[in-house]
Amino acid sequence: MEQEQDTPWTQSTEHINIQKKGSGQQTRRLGRPNLTQLMDHYLRIMSQVDMHKQTVSWKQWLSLKNPTQGSLKTRALKQWKLFNKQGWTD
């Protein structure tokens, strides 16, 4: 019998039942994740993605050399429009 390979996805989303065999060995049976587990996993992943986007955005801001008030305003408006457009399409 072929054993299933655990991936980060199955480890974090699938409910694992551990049972003991007669020989004392433990077997793992992967069950279907419930809605709460899936939502929890989704929110964790999206939070990580959002933090990464924020970090990248701040690095871009900090990399600007001698920004003027006008260039910062223009850049902020572009970022805001892009963010709003992505927010509605996701």
UniProtKB/Swiss-Prot annotation:
Where, per UniProt, does this protein localize?
Host mitochondrion inner membrane; Host nucleus; Host cytoplasm, Host cytosol
The protein in question is named Protein PB1-F2
Q: What gene codes for this chain?
A: PB1
**Protein's UniProt keywords contain Membrane:** yes
User: Where is the site labelled Low pathogenicity?
Assistant: 66
Q: Where is this region: Disordered?
A: 1-30
What the record says about family reads: Belongs to the influenza viruses PB1-F2 family.
Q: Where is the composition biased (Polar residues)?
A: 1-28
Annotated Pfam families = PB1-F2
